[in-house]
Every structure is written in structure tokens, then in C-alpha cells.
């Protein structure tokens, strides 16, 4: 089964949207296999956003993501990376489709509620940054046969 990393950013936590974000993904059928609330330090933020180092917005991005707690999670399911990206909506909330997380709750590109891995490789890297091996929980849900054909 595929896995992806999702993070409700400080604006989403402060606005009380963590439960709403999790609910949307669970109702879609994805399984939550790891979840933690944490305050990211500068070192972790810089490693997480390494691909943006040297860009004009890098320092502000790091400052923002370390400004308050985040909810980090790992979701599991078929085609979870691409489906989660679709459910989140465009990075710029003004361009996000209505009904997506960012289209419904996003305010500004710098305050867009949620982050999700953009590829399986990114998901593996980000999961490794935020979670130790023993923190991902393996379990069978009673409803899985109603979600997935075997």
C-alpha cells in the first residue's frame, strides 16, 4: 500500500482545522498510520524545505513553518500521493478548486493550510524526517474490505 506525508501547517492548527483535514482523508478511505503534533525547529524546517534553499522566499517559509505547532501525519492507501494532492487543491488558494481543502479554507499562498508530498520519493524522504521507524503503526481496519477489492 502506498504512503504519503501530510502536514497541517501553523495556520491550519491555529484555526482549528486539524480534525477537518483528517476527517476528509479518512472519509475518502485513507488510513492514518502516524500522527503527531510538534513545533518544528529551524534545522528540521530547513531540511524539509531543502529544495527551496536559495530561493527568495526560503527564509520566510522557514520562519513561518517554525512559528507555531504543526500536525504531521502519514496516510496509507492506493494512489494516496496523487489523490491527497488533488484533495488539497492548488498551492495558491485563489487557484484551488472549490471543495478542496485550500479552496475551502486557504487564504494566501503563504497561509495555505496544508502540505502534502508531491511524489512517492518525496513522501519517503519526508516521512523519514518526521517519524522514526517504530512510529508508523501497522494495523488492519475492519472496513478495508469495503474500500479495496482484494
From Swiss-Prot:
UniProt-listed InterPro entries: NDK-like_dom, NDK-like_dom_sf, Nucleoside_diP_kinase
One Gene Ontology MF term: nucleoside diphosphate kinase activity
Gene Ontology terms: cellular component: cytoplasm
Catalytic function, reaction form: a 2'-deoxyribonucleoside 5'-diphosphate + ATP = a 2'-deoxyribonucleoside 5'-triphosphate + ADP; a ribonucleoside 5'-diphosphate + ATP = a ribonucleoside 5'-triphosphate + ADP
Residues that coordinate or bind ATP: 9, 57, 85, 91, 102, 112
Active-site annotation: 115 (pros-phosphohistidine intermediate)
Stored PROSITE patterns: NDPK_LIKE (PS51374)
CDD domains in alphabetical order: NDPk_I
Location in or out of the cell: Cytoplasm
Subcellular location, principal: cytoplasm
Cofactor(s) this protein requires: Mg(2+)
Function recorded in the entry: Major role in the synthesis of nucleoside triphosphates other than ATP. The ATP gamma phosphate is transferred to the NDP beta phosphate via a ping-pong mechanism, using a phosphorylated active-site intermediate.
Annotated HAMAP family: NDP_kinase
Family matches, as NCBIfam families: PRK00668.1
Family per similarity comment: Belongs to the NDK family.
Annotated protein name in UniProt: Nucleoside diphosphate kinase
Amino acid at each position: 500500500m502506498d504512503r504519503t506525508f501530510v502536514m497541517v501547517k501553523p495556520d491550519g492548527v491555529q484555526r482549528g482545522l486539524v480534525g477537518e483535514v483528517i476527517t476528509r482523508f479518512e472519509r475518502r478511505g485513507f488510513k492514518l498510520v502516524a500522527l503527531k503534533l510538534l513545533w518544528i525547529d529551524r534545522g528540521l524546517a530547513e531540511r524539509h524545505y531543502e529544495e527551496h534553499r536559495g530561493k527568495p522566499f526560503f527564509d520566510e517559509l522557514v520562519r513561518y513553518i517554525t512559528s507555531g505547532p504543526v500536525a504531521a501525519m502519514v496516510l496509507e492507501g492506493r494512489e494516496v500521493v496523487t489523490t491527497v494532492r488533488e484533495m488539497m487543491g492548488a498551492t495558491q488558494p485563489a487557484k484551488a478548486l472549490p471543495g478542496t481543502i485550500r479552496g475551502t479554507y486557504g487564504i494566501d499562498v503563504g497561509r495555505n493550510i496544508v502540505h502534502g508530498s508531491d511524489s512517492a520519493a518525496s513522501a519517503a524522504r519526508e516521512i523519514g524526517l518526521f517519524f522514526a521507524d517504530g512510529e508508523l503503526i501497522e494495523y488492519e481496519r475492519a472496513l478495508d474490505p469495503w474500500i479495496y477489492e482484494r
